[in-house]
Amino acid sequence: MAFSFGNAGGGGGGVTQGKDLEVIQTEGLGFLALAGDAKVQLTSKWSPPPAPTASLLSIASRKGLVAAAGPDAVHVATTESVRKAFLAEKNGDSEVRPFNPEAKLPLPLRISQLAFTADEQYLVLSAETGGGLRAYDVNSLTQGNTQSAFELATNGETLRQLAPNPMPESAAFCAIVTTNGNLYMANLAERTLVSGPNGPTLRSQVSCAAWSTKGKQLVAGMADGSIYQMTPDGTEKAHIPKPPNLGDYHVSSVVWLENNVFLTIHNPTNSTNPDDKTVYHVITRQQSSGSPPNFTFQKLNDPVEPFVADKTPHHTVLRLKDFPPNLQDLLLVSSTAVETIGLLTRSKTPLATDKPADAITNVFTTTELADDSRRAQLPMSEDMMETYPIGVALDLSSKEKVYKPIPTDEEIEYSPGPLPGLWVLNNEGVLASWWVVYNESIRAGTTYSGIGGSSEVIPASPAPALASSTAPVPAFASPVSKPTFGSPSPATPAFGGPSALGTKASPWATAGGAASSTPTFGQPSFGKPAAPAFGQASFPGLGQKVSPWATGSTTSAAPAFGQSGFASAGTAPGKVFGSSFTAPSSGGFASFATKSGFASLSAPSGGSSIFSSKPGAPLTSAAPEVSMDTDTAFPPPSTKTDKPAFGSSPFVLGSTFKADPTAAHDIEKPKEGESKSLFDTGFGLSLEDAAKQPASAAESKDEEMRSTTPPLPPPTETKPKSIFESTTPTTTPAPQKFEFKTTTPSGFSTLLGSTKPVASSMPNIFATPKPTSAEKPKSIFDTLKPKEESKENLLKASEPPLPPDTTSKAVFQPGSSSSESAESSPGAAAKAAFKVGNDETPKPQKELAPKPEAVPLPPDFVKAKPKTEAKETKAEEPAVSPNLPVKPLAKKAEPIPAVPESASEEEQGQAEEEEAESGEEEEEEEEEGEGEEEEEEEEEEEEEEEEGEEGEEQSEAGSEGSGVDVAKDLSPTAKFGSMTPGYTPHTSLGGMAESTFSTISRSEVAEQSRPLFGEITKNAPPLFPAAGPLPVSPRSPSPVRGVVRSSILRPTETPRPVDTTPVPSRKGLLQKTASFGMSTGQKPAVDPNVKAQRKLAEKLKAEEQVLVDPEDEGIQQILQSKVEPTLRMNEFLAVDTKLAPMKPGRDDVPNACETLWRDINRMIDRLGLNSRSLQSFILGHTSHGKPGGRQKDDLEKPDDWVLIEAYDLGDMIDNKLARELEAGRIKDVEGTMAAIHNLGRDLAKLRAKEEDLRKLFNAQVDPDQIALTKALPLSAEQLAQQNELRRSYASFSKLLTEAEEALTVLKAKLASANAARGRRGAGAAQVPTVDAIIRTINKMTSMAEKRSGDIDVLESQMRKLRIGSLGPAGTPNGNGVGAGTVVPATPGGGGRSRESSPFVTPQSSRRAMFMSPGSVGTATPRGLLAATGTPSPTKKKLSMYTAEEKRELRAREAKRKATLRMLRESLARVGPNVVRLRDDD
């Protein structure tokens, strides 16, 4: 669309070219660097640099936050921490200080626009490629959540400008100008784009936009140079024409200053002419009612004009309005073509004195800073290249006063209050910061309004609730949201989707049928246009790039296989603008393919945002994806337990599960259909509900490492990883990241390709009405519902290993650990248990009985498969109580020895000892073992139920419990095949009577006899009736142990908090159902290992050994040795025993007793060592005191002090030091401060003088400086002194001459007087009188003049002959004539004065005395040249003569000397001749 306004005013109004505005230089404004030359590396360097229109820095002043976008991440930090970074120590020669932000949001693509809304509720981002908007809730960001609140699409168009509304009450509106020239208006409250008369595009051909000061209307700068005024819904209110006499220019930037005052910046459009420069105008509109408006255009000089116009600049204008006392407007202008910051000002009082006051007051002026040191200029890059701003923002969050705001004013120490800050981010990622200093404000004691958080903070209004059919949107747009009311039907997205239950339909397109347009193999849906679904409006247009924020192809609601992000496959299909049901896209900001715009939060989605994993996602685990292979019966991605993010190594010592911040909710049952907020659930959600949020980050790590089963095929590992580390667990049966309510099992799309829907008949292992723990976080150990775990989950998340125990863990098959009995390896039983997971409650396990055979776990020792019994048992079990803790799946443990014979020699030795003790009773033990086991298992079930109740609380507390340790303690004894350790209080694991248990492979046993994770819920009836009260655990008491289980007796693990997970339930189930067939009465065949073990027992009888802890002897020696005093406490020793496990083939009871004995001994040893450490520490601090007590000097060596000297220290501090400090305290504080102030002022003056002296010394010492100084012309003062000196010298010469004359006269008179006296004497010679002498002189003078005339005539004649060769004749100075001499006339016309002739006789010494320095004819340079330029014979060099000439000259000289000698001799002979003159002569 083109507009041709020419110079016509809007509505026929007039257009006037006003007078150009002034340019002034002022000292009343300036910038003060925050910390000298210091800069901060806020983000990494951009390469290639961002677009010139990028705006990558924004500050929320009231909350004190700053956000800056780098090429790889968005950095969010507090402004205070950034300011402190400026004051950090300098690193080397670089002035750039490093900085680590409080929050960092890694991004897969680059950002082009970033801004906080005016109410500081949202941080809005836009991608450099594909555009779109992504909004983050600022409050959630500050709490560590990194999920976006929502996203909006911009039709695949990249943003040129993002202009949030400036008023907090209207902060929901955000103007968007795209690079295609389209103007959109985003309504963040409704999370959609405002639809105007022409749809979402309010106007095309727009180049920029700006809001009014009250945020009620906005103006749009057009590509043709004109401006439109409109309302946020696109209704046009006014039109401002293009400035007159302006060529092909577009509006680059516009600022709405007042209702009728605008500032515009026009740039040439596609111009190659370097003379086409940026043009600034202040437009004033006058309009009387009923008449068209008149516009006055006044030009302003460019405050940031580039030196070389080699590129079209992009300008950013920041405004400080009403800066008291007199500054009405201060506009800070930055340009991408210049590294400096320019100023435009409007002041009530003149800021400069060299212009008329009325010309520069109350009008805008281009303001230059007179003091270069107070200018703001970006630093050079490391390679000394110029940089340019990519982000400019005002910091009004400071609360500190500024030291020396006006450096030249020594009287002002601090500013009256905080100052506005200007922050500029350049393309190197370096942040420069200055304080904006208004001198008049500093001196008047005023502060800029709104600074330091003084402005009223308008609370951010929450986004309107979405339609009831959609899940509540979490603060960070957790895609895990489920239908708010548990509606199994997919909910439509709040924006862009078909209306559902009042959901507002997207203005961008009509709802279309769900299509199956999923990303192609390896094609990320992020940032790519989605294929319109059937019936989908193709708003983006054919071939147009769709915003990466909300891109997604339309597809069924079923999640793509391995898909992550916010586009849940099983959720209500969402749509990007123009698509009714978008396919779940993985990756990209718009992996929220199923969401309207940029992730409709209203619909539960399952894709992972490329921006971050859901809070429930593992820290570094990939976003949730379909967690099962293609053959799985459970398509929902969330059904798979997330694979550990940190490999499969076992956990380190410590609780596997950390405290759940939302533990209070963990105990609650998930509510059907309740939406799960990514952060509402807290950390540590129910393991069983993959759709539920994972546990805390710590839990995720721990749980990840407990998986013991091998990972599944790659398809499940292709899930994209979250850019932001989630703080939630990874392997707690990872809560379904984004619920996949599989409404239609369509093909699953994934970044790596699409796979056909798996088990479409079972859209979700979690029945569509899934309980959501989002609002009611579930304990990590919460009951696991079959729906939550697909068989893939079980396989993927193998048995969570106990904290690292090389011996016990190695003995157990995956899932066989005593402490992990509740979570035996997800083997066939586990898979079978939940092959059908569509319902809320677990289905009978019998149905899945055959499945385990398909995937046997590692070494299957015995093929006897009482699995059927186990499965039947599971089938009999009711649904696991949602409140019962569930053992989370975790990282797979280290490989486990498969055969009991592989036990170490030490184990065998111990086993032999046990056999020796129980030798002949083995067979009886086997028979009795069944009975005992049955009773004990029943007791364990009861105990299990109690533990289940307590487990929730303890799981919330993050304690694994000694149950885990003991499980490992017992696990060594369970090395009988896959035997799972029993609870010592109830049964002795490892009894040969139970050896039949070992005949069943561990995986099978686990699979057969346990629920998904092997736990018995407290709601589930015991498989076997309780057999009486629980036996007391033989384990020693522990303050951290609640319910003690038999599994706690493992000797090889340090005691831990009670593991309240219902581990024993699985063991009991396994042992009863699998080994003894207590439920079904089936017994497996006799374990072949039993015979071998019996033979081994016979051998052990002969080689009976005493059961001894291998470390016991050394520890006893240490305990019996003398206690050595020490001043440092040794580290507390926990029971980290690494004793070799007991050998298999022993009776349960003896084996358990031995384990218990070793464990107790180990604990006692550790207690002794800890006690010894305390004794050494106490002894050291009681015996190493300084004799005679401590003195003040001892304070210099704090390490030498001991605890018993604390009293000396207290006395010293309270008495001696206190008195000395009091004595040294400054009494006259004010006087001292005044003296210091005076000294400071004097010091400043001295420093200034020192600097002057240093410059003076340099000028006198440096030869170059001296030469330069001499070459400089004389100053006016020096010239005056020179002239005065010349006048004085002339006067002195005149006086001297007069004195000489008077002296001569005096001598003459004396001579006359002597002569008179001499006549009286006889024969006295007469002396001539004065008169006679005067007459003689006059006569001689006349004779000389006569001769002079003759000489002049002769000179003239000679000149005619030779002078032409000596110099140009006829010129005033060509023949040596001095300045002012008379040029000779034509031949015969008279001679010239011989005074100026080069042949003139030198003046007598007397006459020279009458000459002043300025009276010489050659005083001028030309005269000097004339006087000295004419050559004379005497000045001819000897080398210039020939040999002949030399002989001639020598001969002449000889004659002359001879003549002179003859003259002297003659005069000597004649003697003096006295001539007497008469008076008449």
UniProtKB/Swiss-Prot annotation:
GO cellular component terms given for this protein: nuclear membrane; nuclear pore
Keyword terms: Coiled coil, Membrane, mRNA transport, Nuclear pore complex, Nucleus, Protein transport, Repeat, Translocation, Transport, WD repeat
Basic and acidic residues: compositionally biased ranges: 663-677, 773-794, 837-850, 862-877
GO biological process: mRNA transport; protein import into nucleus; RNA export from nucleus
Span list, region Disordered: 607-647, 662-991, 1385-1404, 1414-1443
A Pfam family of this chain: Beta-prop_NUP159_NUP214
Biased composition (Low complexity): 607-616, 814-833
UniProt remark on domains: Contains FG repeats. FG repeats are interaction sites for karyopherins (importins, exportins) and form probably an affinity gradient, guiding the transport proteins unidirectionally with their cargo through the NPC. FG repeat regions are highly flexible and lack ordered secondary structure. The overall conservation of FG repeats regarding exact sequence, spacing, and repeat unit length is limited. FG repeat types and their physico-chemical environment change across the NPC from the nucleoplasmic to the cytoplasmic side: PXFG repeats are especially abundant in NUPs on the cytoplasmic side.
Protein name in UniProt: Nucleoporin NUP159
Species, as recorded: Chaetomium thermophilum (strain DSM 1495 / CBS 144.50 / IMI 039719) (Thermochaetoides thermophila)
Phylogenetic placement of the source organism: Eukaryota, Fungi, Dikarya, Ascomycota, Pezizomycotina
